[in-house]
Amino acid sequence: MEINLLFFVSVVPAIVLYGIAKSGLGGSISLISVPLMTVVMPLNQALAIILPILIFSDIIAVYRFRREFDFGTLKLIVPFAAIGIIIGSFTFTYFSEDLLKLIVGIMGFLFSGHYFLFKKEKTIPAKKNFFKGAICSSIAGFSSFCVHAGGTPTSLYLLPLRMKKEIYVGTRIIFFSCVNLIKLPCLLYTSPSPRDKRQAR
């Protein structure tokens, strides 16, 4: 990877935006970080650079919310997210970068539309649904592995449960901490070895 002016114009702002978003100040601006980095590097390399930042920030966040989470919800969504991650790791090389971005974009649009069209009264919490939790968390694991963008399907399942704010935030943090740790060996699996890199040259 060549480090030049384009690298600093695209990668450095992308990492800064990701840091701001993880601090809670930037909302969903982190969604543009990975696409911005792919201007100058392959997608899997961009994912590998972002992942340690995610894990480091997770450590701090988990410590803060270590007593505020819904264990019952996590028991459902973490295993299915792991399944989605494994599927993503085995199919990752078969998708082009543009196709992956398109898939995640379409999923985000559909999930957002579903939430706003079918949401119930804010005072009525939805019941935990095994099938919905399994589907949403599996897709969250897949999209999180492919482009670090699993927030939308996760929110689609968690928000209707109307948890207390601290419990919702803590559950979400613990969930993505587990997801990021599971992604680490899977991302190493999909990364080209030094021998492959030399042969590619």
Region spans (language model):
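Transmembrane alpha-helices of multi-pass small-molecule transport proteins
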Residues: 43-64, 177-178
